[in-house]
């Protein structure tokens, strides 16, 4: 009885600590949103948000962009956490395993075939199909146990390099100005996002919320196939549903902002290091932290140069690469 009471008390203490972390992440997200609405070539502080310039810069330009950044950051971070559980690989991430590049190839192909005249919903659908196809290929390797985790990571990186090369060749031989601009966009950026793209931004929200509610299933799946089946989890059904959700999030994110790496890799690991290990609360934490971190990266991309805007993919890669190397060393040390 005492052991049971002690276990219950420890669970309650862990839950309270997790909720404190989640509250802190929400505060960080709101702070990042405040900075994002103020920052730019012209800094506009809250007391001037309802002036003539504030109505233009804050409400018409920065607010829709910030909403898109939050949803894309949340989508990539949650997708990364789900992929790490689904592939049983701590280094799985949409950008690193080539899923985002697969979406990019499909999108570039659609631009080429449509001569730059296709509507945004068609391009988004193509990006989703590309992300789904790449995720399904990787999942088939995992389910058949043909590759170790390290080999799967290398295959994903190789597929991503192939996709990146295909996009580069397409742009090199194209005479279309739209496609050359698209190549810059594929480096990651939100400069073209305004209120017209908010239907795509809102399309991310229900999928992110649904994934955040599947922590219990992911906890069961992490116990192993046999234990998960004994607990009543249909692995085939849930794998397909999770792959579909990941493809949807990554495809729409690529259609909105291009390929942005390392958010899906670094955010879940940092949160686990702080003690958020239960998937039921880790996924929500990833959504808040992913949105906040990408907002701050977007502020850096907008303000670090006075005459131009950096691609946000460059900022996240610069900040994420050292952390990725550290994670590789740490995972090897744990093994």
Swiss-Prot record:
Gene3D superfamilies: ABC transporter involved in vitamin B12 uptake, BtuC (1.10.3470.10). It comes from Yersinia pestis. Its main location: membrane. One of its GO terms (biological process) is cobalamin transport. Belongs to the binding-protein-dependent transport system permease family. FecCD subfamily. The complex is composed of two ATP-binding proteins (BtuD), two transmembrane proteins (BtuC) and a solute-binding protein (BtuF). One of its GO terms (cellular component) is plasma membrane. The chain crosses the membrane at residues 21-43, 65-87, 94-113, 117-139, 152-174, 241-263, 283-305, 310-329. It is found in: Cell inner membrane. The keyword Transport applies. HAMAP family: BtuC. This is Vitamin B12 import system permease protein BtuC. It is a multi-pass membrane protein. NCBIfam families: PRK03784.1 (NF003001). Pfam families: FecCD (PF01032). It comes from the Bacteria. Part of the ABC transporter complex BtuCDF involved in vitamin B12 import. Involved in the translocation of the substrate across the membrane. Keywords: Cell inner membrane, Cell membrane, Membrane, Transmembrane, Transmembrane helix, Transport.
